């Protein structure tokens, strides 16, 4: 078992004035297909870290993507092109690929993400390489993960369902805290006030809904 802190790794304390306290905040980890462990060092200067299978570290500076002073990064996922998708507290979602040092941010701005909220709390990537983003004000998906760095317009889209014949956004403006994808590619959404919603792979059919009453 290994235990990494700012004393023996590039992980950073955000309260460096207190030498007796560990204040490193890691909000997400994911392995790539080469066995590298990618880490979101939430309040660090270099917020993205990589630990190789051989034990070497590398840090990445994503500050060029930041548009809001609330700098914290949240969870991290990796798509089939080895691009990393990183949710942030107030800066949308960062996308990074080490091959070519490519970076991009999806924000609330039209044509540059059109996210319903800049607080992206959860990220999930399904079997079709579709990216699901849970924000403070609703759910959106991004369908062109492999082309994210080349697209001139890269808006995410809500899932539109029919409710008694009326088009509505799946989960409306609810806060989505977590998204899980099971082996059948079905989706599980954990919300702030609406319990858990379980849908088929494309989100069009609700398979179950769980709350305090059931």
Predicted regions and their residues:
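Carboxylate-rich, polar loop motifs that coordinate divalent cations or form catalytic acidic clusters
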Residues: 1-214
């Amino acid at each position: 078992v290994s235990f990494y802190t700012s004393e023996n790794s590039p992980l950073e304390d955000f309260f460096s004035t207190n030498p007796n306290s560990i204040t490193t905040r890691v909000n997400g980890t994911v392995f790539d297909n080469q066995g590298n462990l990618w880490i979101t060092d939430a309040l660090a200067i270099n917020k993205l870290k990589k630990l190789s299978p051989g034990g070497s570290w590398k840090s990445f500076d994503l500050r060029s993507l930041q548009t809001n002073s609330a700098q914290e990064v949240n969870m991290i996922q990796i798509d089939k092109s080895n691009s990393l998708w990183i949710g942030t507290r107030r800066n949308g979602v960062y996308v990074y690929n080490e091959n070519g040092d490519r970076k991009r941010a999806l924000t609330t701005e039209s044509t540059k993400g059109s996210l319903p909220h800049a607080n992206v709390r959860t990220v999930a990537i399904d079997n079709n390489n579709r990216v699901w983003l849970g924000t403070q004000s609703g759910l959106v998906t991004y369908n062109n993960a492999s082309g994210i760095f080349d697209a001139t317009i890269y808006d995410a889209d809500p899932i539109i369902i029919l409710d008694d014949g009326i088009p509505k956004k799946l989960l409306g403006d609810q806060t989505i805290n977590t998204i899980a994808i099971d082996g059948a590619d079905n989706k599980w959404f954990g919300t702030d006030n609406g319990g858990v919603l379980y849908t088929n792979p494309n989100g069009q059919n609700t398979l179950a809904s769980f709350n305090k009453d059931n």
